[in-house]
């Protein structure tokens, strides 16, 4: 399976850094958060990462503009219905993550890969909130 578009749930520090890495690799990425303000803050954070690269001479302004064309925002999870991979990157709250995985299971295509950036919670427990293997 090829990954043509990625979704990241959570526009905090980890989510924005994941979105930056994905877009830097040349893959379109949708950064999803609960509201417009949070999602836009995430987009601004990705732009700031790229601007720091421009300031250091590691990329030029045209490259920054090209990379930012790959980054979009979604206010809620509905904007992730056509992605190939979703990476959940919200706070380490089992109830919240379980709810997100349940919703993603309903919204995303059957062949969409659902992944988590959790470092402390059981991935099996999160996966149990879906109807996927």
Regions found by a protein language model. Give the residues of each.
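Phosphate-coordination loops involved in phosphoryl transfer and adenosine-cofactor binding
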Residues: 2-5, 68, 83, 111
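Short glycine-centered segments of the SAM/dcSAM-binding site in methyltransferase folds
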Residues: 28, 85, 113
């Amino acid at each position: 399976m090829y990954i043509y578009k990625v979704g990241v749930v959570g526009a905090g520090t980890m989510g924005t850094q994941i979105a930056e890495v994905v877009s830097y690799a040349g893959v379109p990425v949708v950064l999803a958060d609960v509201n417009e303000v949070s999602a836009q803050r995430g987009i601004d954070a990705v732009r700031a990462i790229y601007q720091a690269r421009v300031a250091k001479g590691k990329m030029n302004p045209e490259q920054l503009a090209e990379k930012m064309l790959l980054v979009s925002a979604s206010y809620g999870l509905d904007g992730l219905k056509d992605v190939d991979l979703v990476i959940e990157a919200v706070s380490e709250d089992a109830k919240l993550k379980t709810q997100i995985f349940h919703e993603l299971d309903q919204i995303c295509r059957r062949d969409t890969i659902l992944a988590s950036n959790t470092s402390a919670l059981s991935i099996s427990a999160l996966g149990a909130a879906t109807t996927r293997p």
